[in-house]
């Protein structure tokens, strides 16, 4: 059959569909693609508006400034493009009767305060439940220019918010009134940490998940404490950008916390961690700055991980443990350990951790090629599942695997991710692993 006839038949079949069916199809497309269909023909020009009318509660409105092509030169043209994007967002939101999920991303160019305020007003009026807004303002907003409306949308269940204001700090932290908010994600927010705890979090009475990424705040002398206090919080993620000169005192009052992920410098010795016994899983990426080491202390870190069932340690965390000769407590509840090190000294921490983890069942390793030539000796343990990532098949890796298999008498499965781009090399590594000394019949190897 002629190719042109097939294409023509396909177009005719689509065009024969009722407008309501086509609008339903558009509701499954990303907003940018759904809007672009208006260029197909006169009939398609109004289908996006029909989709908004019929399926607005099901569609995720995703609007970003890459929807428009930026001219390479000419400030006048750029201003026109920015205004055009603002008009497009404003018209799209105005055409909606209700909005459940909305994302507006303007990472490339600065947004005007009046536009942001208008978009938030539209979202608030239409009962938005899930809001994701990320933009830059190009200046430090005053209290009147800061988009406070975002923290007063009472229908919000999930809020993701990022604002870039250059190298200046936010002069204050707005009070939140978010009675049904359960998940709060803040990116690159520049205000003092204690103001977050005292001004914003009290307005989120049922908050369960708090994510603070690239948290900067004030310098050590201006804002000495990092404090999180919340009774219903279950998941907490804190990613500092390591801009602080010194370790900071940290205080946690989170009796319901189950998951903690922390990335940044080690806290100072005056930190107080209350109510962390409920923790089930902890991920640590803890750094230490040697010129400031008198201010940083590891006892708070050990307190965090004392009762967890799942623990993840980054190379920086492992380095911190061996460089400071940390005395480890018994991890009486630990059943799964993620361990990664890119230095041979770091692998000396692994036997100590295994000896302190009597209930450990799953061990996940990465960076095995950095272990010493003679391998790391471990005592017999209860591990049943061993996972190895980035295995290239070098001699020291193979020797280390043999050592682990010899002491893991209860091991049932070993999962290995082969790091080889060449298929022939990958096959050689697989055959090498399969030729290792035979184990009991219950043991088997899986390749990831």
Swiss-Prot record:
GO terms for cellular component: vacuole. LRR repeats lie at residues 82-106, 185-214, 215-240, 310-341, 342-367. InterPro entries: F-box-like_dom_sf (IPR036047), F-box_AtFBL13-like (IPR053781), F-box_dom (IPR001810), FBD (IPR006566), FBL60-like (IPR055294), LRR_dom_sf (IPR032675), LRR_FXL15/At3g58940/PEG3-like (IPR055411). SMART domains: FBD, FBOX. The keyword Repeat applies. PANTHER family: BNAC06G06520D PROTEIN, RNI-LIKE SUPERFAMILY PROTEIN. This is Putative F-box/LRR-repeat protein At5g25860. It comes from Arabidopsis thaliana.
